[in-house]
């Protein structure tokens, strides 16, 4: 019997924060594998513009390449309509009846569990794992395993914004992902811009160093 961690998301784009979070849960719970689950159409983002599935999948492949226990499950990309976790987990359980599934969520999602589609049935199929973050409560009426992880203040929206502004994203995403974004012109990228240290980057680094001078 395998212990499988499921990490769902749009991964638009995937970044080192995703990988760090997945690896911490893998180690803390001694899981067999982590399956990254790219969404086709997340219910909470139905009105947002999301990068094409094939681009997000390719970036995710580049991000997890080389980690022997990181894999990608494309079940939601292959299914039409909103990507409800209940439908996905029910299908995975049917396909892999001898495995145990652990669904990984950030602390910011824990308080929303009561609003998840068919949550009372879902908790009978999967164990939720919440990764702690400062400023977010882990209180919920549903069972959640809490996992500590180092804080890495990066988000997909931040990366998209930096690319649009012509700022570097080196060391925020795996190198293969950075090059793919540049090659495909995703998020408004222009060739060569994502790799150049700009005046804005240097100013941001100086500001960060100043804020952290007494506590970092």
Swiss-Prot record:
Q: What class of enzyme is it?
A: transferase
SUPFAM superfamilies (alphabetical)? Nucleotidylyl transferase (SSF52374)
* GO annotation, biological process: NAD biosynthetic process
Residue runs in coiled coils: none
UniProt xrefs under InterPro entries: Cyt_trans-like (IPR004821), NadD/NMNAT (IPR005248), Rossmann-like_a/b/a_fold (IPR014729)
- EC number(s) from the headed UniProt entry: 2.7.7.18
- Keyword Transferase in the entry? The reply is yes
Pathway note: Cofactor biosynthesis; NAD(+) biosynthesis; deamido-NAD(+) from nicotinate D-ribonucleotide: step 1/1
Q: Which UniProt keywords apply?
A: ATP-binding, NAD, Nucleotide-binding, Nucleotidyltransferase, Pyridine nucleotide biosynthesis, Transferase
Q: Extract the Pfam families matched here.
A: CTP_transf_like
* HAMAP family named in the record: NaMN_adenylyltr (MF_00244)
- General function of this protein: Catalyzes the reversible adenylation of nicotinate mononucleotide (NaMN) to nicotinic acid adenine dinucleotide (NaAD).
Per the similarity annotation, which family is this?
Answer: Belongs to the NadD family.
Q: What is this protein called?
A: Probable nicotinate-nucleotide adenylyltransferase
The major lineage groups are: Bacteria, Bacillati, Bacillota, Bacilli, Bacillales
């Amino acid at each position: 019997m395998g212990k499988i961690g499921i990490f769902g998301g749009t991964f638009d784009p995937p970044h080192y924060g995703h990988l760090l979070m997945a690896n911490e849960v893998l180690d803390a719970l001694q899981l067999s594998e982590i399956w990254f689950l790219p969404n086709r159409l997340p219910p909470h983002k139905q009105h947002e513009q999301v990068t094409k599935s094939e681009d997000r999948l390719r970036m995710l492949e580049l991000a997890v390449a080389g980690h022997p226990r990181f894999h990608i499950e494309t079940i939601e990309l292959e299914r039409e309509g909103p990507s409800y976790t209940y439908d996905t987990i029910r299908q995975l359980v049917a396909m892999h009846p001898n495995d145990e599934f652990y669904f990984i969520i950030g602390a910011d999602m824990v308080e929303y569990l009561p609003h998840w589609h068919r949550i009372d049935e879902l908790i009978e199929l999967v164990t939720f794992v919440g990764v702690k973050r400062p400023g977010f409560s882990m209180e919920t009426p549903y069972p959640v395993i809490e996992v500590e992880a180092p804080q890495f203040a990066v988000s997909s929206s931040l990366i998209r914004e930096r690319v649009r502004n012509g700022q570097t994203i080196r060391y925020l995403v795996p190198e293969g992902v950075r090059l793919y974004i540049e090659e495909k012109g995703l998020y408004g990228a222009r060739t060569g811009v994502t790799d150049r240290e700009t005046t804005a980057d240097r100013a941001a680094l100086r500001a960060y160093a100043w804020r952290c001078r007494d506590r970092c």
